[in-house]
Amino acid sequence: MAARLKERYDKQLRAELMKELGFANPMQAPRLEKIVVNMGLGEAINNGKIIDASVEQLAAITGQKPVVTRARKSIANFKLRQGQSIGAMVTLRGDRMYEFFDRLVSIALPRVRDFKGVSPKAFDGKGNYTLGVREQIIFPEINYDKVEKIKGLNITVVTTARNDEEGRALLRHLGMPFRQ
């Protein structure tokens, strides 16, 4: 069974986007390509256990096993060695991507303290959107009692949009709560 949001996009939202953006061919309408969830763990330099806990939490949030990112080169000022683990990242595609986006928009973002909407300016010029989340505990999959340290994560939504207006229209139709 396809994800709820994907079915809604195929049946209803694609036609609305085509009409709004003036496209004739359904393949011209922008769609989600992938979502990259990244957790940078600079403090893992001193404490290796942080990586394991973060990988576990990221797997719970996304439903997919993360890749541990390693330092490309040594930087003495940061006490960083080449090959040392400094983060974790997951690339979501297909149904998992739509389900994660649905949970992010409908459950996680409304749980952020003093949430007034996400910035409409965080597009990169090519229709992709990046969002920073300060606390991983906004996701219902994370058990607050088992969290040792509150960490943030970056979520990048990659779309097939050609420019920011198309990307903004797509995310607005998919339910992203932009600030007014």
Curated annotation (Swiss-Prot):
InterPro entries: Ribosomal_uL5, Ribosomal_uL5_bac-type, Ribosomal_uL5_C, Ribosomal_uL5_CS, Ribosomal_uL5_dom_sf, Ribosomal_uL5_N
Transmembrane segments: none
UniProtKB keywords: Ribonucleoprotein, Ribosomal protein, RNA-binding, rRNA-binding, tRNA-binding
Top-rank taxon: Bacteria
GO CC term, one of those recorded: ribosome
Chain's role: This is one of the proteins that bind and probably mediate the attachment of the 5S RNA into the large ribosomal subunit, where it forms part of the central protuberance. In the 70S ribosome it contacts protein S13 of the 30S subunit (bridge B1b), connecting the 2 subunits; this bridge is implicated in subunit movement. Contacts the P site tRNA; the 5S rRNA and some of its associated proteins might help stabilize positioning of ribosome-bound tRNAs.
Quaternary organization: Part of the 50S ribosomal subunit; part of the 5S rRNA/L5/L18/L25 subcomplex. Contacts the 5S rRNA and the P site tRNA. Forms a bridge to the 30S subunit in the 70S ribosome.
Protein name (record): Large ribosomal subunit protein uL5
Gene that produces this protein: rplE
